Amino acid sequence: MTANTGEPYKRHSNESPVDRNINVNAIQSDKFLSLLLSMVPVVCQTGQEERLKKVNGLTPIGYGFNIRTDQHLEFHNLSEPNYLGNGLHCSSLCSTNYDFDGYDYCDGINASETDAMLQDSRSSADGDKDALVEGSKKQTKESSIAMALQILVPFLLAGFGTVSAGMVLDIVQHWDVFKNLTEVFILVPALLGLKGNLEMTLASRLSTAVNVGKMDSPIEKWNLIIGNLALKQVQATVVGFLAAVFAVILGWIPDGKYQLDHAILLCSSSVATAFIASLLQGIIMVGVIVGSKKTGINPDNVATPIAASFGDLITLAILAWISQGLYNCLGSYAFVSPLVGVFFLAMTPIWIVIASKHPATRTVLHSGWEPVITAMLISSIGGLILDTTVSDPNLVGIVVYTPVINGIGGNLVAIQASRISTYLHLYSIPGELPEDAKGCYHPCRTFCGTGVNNKSAQVLLSLVIPGHLIFLYTIYLMKSGHTSLTPIFVAVYLLAALLQVFALLWIADWMVHHIWRKGKDPDSFSIPYLTALGDLLGTALLAISFHILWIIGDRDGDVGD
């Protein structure tokens, strides 16, 4: 595609296909880079663009897509008999009075990868239409029980992963680097939030691609995978560096001073952790998506929880190990910290070149930074709350529960966001909401009703209390933490967790539809915001809960002491 160049496409009826492979002669002087680039397939660019040119009635112009009214009607007539969503499908969406020729799908220059990855699924060949019909049938046949059973196992796996992360954090908080360089605590929610910024976004994006039939071709599948992994590494490196800079600033504000070697250590630890953890989790996530497709499981239900099942544990363990190692080198090997940071930052241009070669990720590479960076800033504020709370010796018990409440809330809201996004991709067009999705968003609209999105919200909310009870009891059996499970503590903790997920699901219902109405892809834009809000809400509510428990006299701290 050339949507990012602003050059229009024109249909050629009797001309031979145009070769649009990217010329990399300009960089062939670097033999290593040339070898690396030669390993990356670029066939999908030619294939996708030529299919777009051959589509009857579709002429992409710049950032927008002009669609003929009769073709749009044909698409909706095809999918309309299978529609069993939140309400009756309103035919006004396909009214001939609507000016489709003048409609800009991508809302100006803010084009999203929805168009690069999914645009021909709305108007291309019959095979794509069949894939849409098949996907909608799968969704309409999914009952609440089947949905709950599919979500339950990965939800429990993700929960035990967050429990493990909390236990690790409870141990490493006593390490020298965490005691002498408390700004590391500010990094914890931001780096763990990369799971929501990157891993869950990747899972949701690929899940949507699977459900609309865009990963049926092996060439398209591997081009999507390689492009998304390269994009994720770029984002992880940049966000890791910015998170460290923000942590240094937040640590400098209270006292008005900082040490340069500590600032370099934070930056190097953050960048290295983000890069390594993101690469490992990305490979795992690709395996989960491909495996779900082969086994017939809806990846929307399992991909996002599994993306977080061991993500927190891996990220936290890598952060603790690298930061402690670099801290030990401060005295005699001071050059190690800057060397580590420079090494990982120097690899960023390579990933940028690879990601820019794939149409599914090229647009996100230019316009997808806003949600990722904003989410990092929101998570860092949660980290500041955690750092302040941990500094109080009476409230150290919060450490073991913070990854649990944040991780569970982020997992559940990511599932809901991914399902709503898939629903919109199947039954609507970017920039236009279904008739039943218009109006004011309130809790009753989110949780009351018989639509597929209402049912999923009900199922996810019902998992909060039993899930957290299991995880609390697991922490108790493992003798971890500094707080006993008194009835008052359990009640206050469960109330905080329930309020967090309730608010997140409500916000997700509004945010996903709002982003879709703006012509952007909710898979890339909503999940980072939602998981970051989950981190902030979870940490804040947990801190308030511990303060309340301390005030009313529930101060037992013998467990794990």
UniProtKB/Swiss-Prot annotation:
InterPro entries: SLC41_membr_dom, SLC41_membr_dom_sf, SLC41A1-3
Reaction catalyzed: Mg(2+)(in) = Mg(2+)(out); Mn(2+)(in) = Mn(2+)(out); Co(2+)(in) = Co(2+)(out); Ni(2+)(in) = Ni(2+)(out)
MF terms (GO), sorted A to Z: monoatomic cation transmembrane transporter activity
GO cellular component terms attached to this protein's record: plasma membrane
UniProt-annotated location(s): Cell membrane
Ranges of the Cytoplasmic topological domain: 172-183, 255-270, 323-333, 386-394, 479-487, 553-561
Chain segments annotated as transmembrane: 151-171, 184-204, 234-254, 271-291, 302-322, 334-354, 365-385, 395-415, 458-478, 488-508, 532-552
Lipid bilayer topology: Multi-pass membrane protein
Extracellular face of the membrane: 1-150, 205-233, 292-301, 355-364, 416-457, 509-531
GO BP annotation list: cobalt ion transport; iron ion transport; magnesium ion transport; manganese ion transport; nickel cation transport
Keyword annotations of the record: Cell membrane, Ion transport, Magnesium, Membrane, Repeat, Transmembrane, Transmembrane helix, Transport
Described function: Acts as a plasma-membrane magnesium transporter. Can also mediate the transport of other divalent metal cations in an order of Ba(2+) > Ni(2+) > Co(2+) > Fe(2+) > Mn(2+).
Similarity-based family: Belongs to the SLC41A transporter family.
UniProt protein name: Solute carrier family 41 member 2
Species for this entry: Xenopus laevis
Lineage summary: Eukaryota, Metazoa, Chordata, Craniata, Vertebrata
Gene this protein is translated from: slc41a2
